[in-house]
Amino acid sequence: MLFRSYQKSVLKIGQPRLIDIRTRKTKYIFFIGPTGVGKTTTIAKIASTLRLTKQTKVALITSDTYRIAAVDQLKTYANILGIPLQVVYSPQDMKPAMEELSEYDLVFVDTAGRSHNNKEQKEDIQNLLDTVEDANKEVFLVLSATTKYKDLVKIAQTYSEITKYNLIFTKLDETETVGSLYNIHMLTGAPLSYATWGQNVPDDIGKIDAQSMAKKLLGGNS
């Protein structure tokens, strides 16, 4: 019976939806989500991994000009990796930034943390996403595994009204449970992708493994 439950859980979780690096045109990878979940650090982890291990030509764009030192943080990562960074202050700035980075395979777009309760801020995210055609972009909603489940539900549902997305969960090192990850995945139908468990760049990140999660859900060791 336990094995059957394990099999069902694995099938429901499915395979992680990772960034597709097989692209002929520049692809834009947007990272959206509330404040304080680790979007910028997650971008640095993924960008550095692809840059160093896959030799992917990557670049960065940030629209997070609201948070103190946010641009400087991403600029530091860009300098270390030797990759370009464009700063945009409005959706209108995206076109010239995209023209500057048209020779790159992947462009990671860091967005400002937004309140899911603020209509104007939701529209800001929508307008930014609309600057890139669906065929040329992927969107990742970054959530913290430590956030209360009730709040996760509200956040995920609100962003579902804006766009389709894949799920990234951060701060797994700060919690013992993974039930909220599974439940949000089932609630939204959004594919799971990456998980992070620390601040080290480019380490402490990996794909969400269905077998490991199923074992944890059933009370076993991962």
Can you say where each PLM-predicted feature lies in the sequence?
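C-terminal-of-GTPase-core extension/linker across diverse P-loop GTPases
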Residues: 3-33, 37, 90, 100-105, ...
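Conserved catalytic network of the ASCE P-loop NTPase/AAA+ motor domain
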Residues: 23, 51-54, 78-81, 99-104, ...
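Short acidic loop-to-helix transition motifs that present clustered carboxylates
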Residues: 66-68, 90-94, 148
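Conserved ATPase-coupling elements of RecA-like P-loop NTPase cores
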Residues: 71, 116-122, 151-153, 178-180
